[in-house]
């Protein structure tokens, strides 16, 4: 069928991940080659999912001794409660247990209270332990209880407030996303002798709770899962499906020689120079591999794709146990059926 071209579109042949200055948090991810226009499509989709849909952990509420609401101040603490809340939002957390969980901070002045002063709990790790929460003057004594939970995206303080919240519990806006920054760039790239492909480069920075390349992988998996509902047909039969009538483990058409396809002289010579003898050899090549063949261009590629399509085949197919040991004998056996 003419519409069944998804397997013939060129796919990225390599994913290059270059760590940044902080490998646990920064990386540049490059994918190429992509069909023209796919760089922008994929880059934009991945960026949106990275920023909005990955699971992370955040502080969702705080309760400070002798404080009734967020517009208060704490004796001996330089920052007011509003500033303390803002600083708590900046605490990066890796959480490997089901939430919500309660943590606490107990400190006396003089000194600086940092994220490293948050109490430890199994399955919860504070990543930016030097992050400043507040400054205490001499004689100051502060105790606060924190609620930590998992989620995705942004959740307002109003939604984080429990119905049975005790007096003094202050809900906090939660920014769960472990991804802090994402930018992408699309540049033209060459594949063989063809120049009109895309190269997608993404710069990703996380809070350290997961690596940038894992973040991209999770985002891609989310997109894959969400798009599956739109596929309203079954996959075509594989070329390696057994043919019950002849006992072969593959389509006998794969035994036909490419010399019999009546290709143009240029295309035929390119296949010959690349030691492609049978259709079974040809269909296992990807578009990218074909375009790397010397003197093989887009015109030859389109010609071969059209011929294969007429046979119900396409480039990039997977054929198990190819080539068979007795391929020449099998080719002669089925020669009259082609």
UniProtKB/Swiss-Prot annotation:
Domain of life: Bacteria
UniProt keyword terms in alphabetical order: DNA-directed RNA polymerase, Nucleotidyltransferase, Transcription, Transferase
GO biological process, one term: DNA-templated transcription
Molecular function (Gene Ontology), one example: DNA binding
Region described as Alpha N-terminal domain (alpha-NTD): spans on this chain: 1-234
Any single GO CC term annotated in Swiss-Prot or TrEMBL for this entry: cytoplasm
Catalytic activity: RNA(n) + a ribonucleoside 5'-triphosphate = RNA(n+1) + diphosphate
EC nos: 2.7.7.6
UniProt xrefs under CDD domains: RNAP_alpha_NTD
InterPro entries: DNA-dir_RNA_pol_insert, DNA-dir_RNA_pol_RpoA/D/Rpb3, DNA-dir_RpoA, RBP11-like, RNAP_asu_C, RNApol_insert_sf
The protein's enzyme class: transferase
HAMAP family referenced in this protein's UniProt entry, alphabetically: RNApol_bact_RpoA
Family, similarity comment: Belongs to the RNA polymerase alpha chain family.
Domain notes: The N-terminal domain is essential for RNAP assembly and basal transcription, whereas the C-terminal domain is involved in interaction with transcriptional regulators and with upstream promoter elements.
Quaternary assembly: Homodimer. The RNAP catalytic core consists of 2 alpha, 1 beta, 1 beta' and 1 omega subunit. When a sigma factor is associated with the core the holoenzyme is formed, which can initiate transcription.
Function: DNA-dependent RNA polymerase catalyzes the transcription of DNA into RNA using the four ribonucleoside triphosphates as substrates.
Protein name: DNA-directed RNA polymerase subunit alpha
Biological source species: Roseobacter denitrificans (strain ATCC 33942 / OCh 114) (Erythrobacter sp. (strain OCh 114))
Lineage: Bacteria, Pseudomonadati, Pseudomonadota, Alphaproteobacteria, Rhodobacterales
Gene this protein is translated from: rpoA
């Amino acid at each position: 069928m003419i519409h069944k071209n998804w397997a013939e579109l060129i796919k990225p042949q390599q994913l290059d991940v270059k760590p940044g200055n902080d490998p646990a948090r920064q990386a540049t991810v490059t994918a190429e080659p992509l069909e023209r226009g796919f760089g922008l499509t994929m880059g934009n989709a991945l960026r949106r999912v990275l920023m909005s849909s990955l699971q992370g952990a955040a502080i969702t509420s705080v309760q400070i001794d002798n404080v009734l609401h967020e517009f208060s101040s704490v004796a001996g603490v330089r920052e007011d409660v509003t500033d303390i809340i803002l600083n708590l939002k900046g605490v990066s957390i890796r959480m490997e247990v089901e939430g919500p969980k309660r943590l606490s901070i107990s400190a006396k002045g003089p000194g600086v209270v940092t994220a490293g002063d948050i109490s430890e709990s199994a399955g919860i790790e504070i990543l930016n332990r030097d992050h400043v929460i507040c400054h205490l003057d001499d004689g100051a004594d502060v105790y606060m209880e924190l609620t930590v939970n998992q989620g995705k995206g942004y959740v307002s303080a109003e939604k984080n407030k429990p119905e049975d919240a005790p007096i003094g519990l202050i809900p906090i806006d939660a920014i769960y996303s472990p991804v802090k920054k994402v930018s992408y760039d699309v540049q033209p790239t060459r594949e063989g002798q063809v120049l009109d492909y895309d190269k997608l480069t993404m710069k990703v920075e996380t809070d350290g709770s997961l690596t940038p390349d894992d973040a991209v992988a999770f985002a891609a998996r989310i997109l894959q899962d969400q798009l599956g509902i739109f596929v309203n047909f079954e996959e075509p039969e594989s070329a390696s499906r057994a043919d019950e009538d002849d006992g072969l483990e593959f389509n006998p058409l794969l035994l036909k020689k490419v010399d019999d396809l009546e290709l143009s002289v240029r295309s035929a010579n390119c296949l010959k120079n690349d030691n492609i003898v049978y259709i079974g050899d040809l269909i296992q090549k990807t578009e990218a591999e074909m375009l790397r063949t010397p003197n093989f261009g887009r015109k030859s590629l389109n010609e071969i794709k059209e011929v294969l399509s007429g046979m119900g085949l396409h480039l990039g197919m997977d054929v198990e146990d190819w080539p068979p040991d007795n391929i020449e004998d099998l080719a002669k056996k089925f020669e009259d059926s082609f």
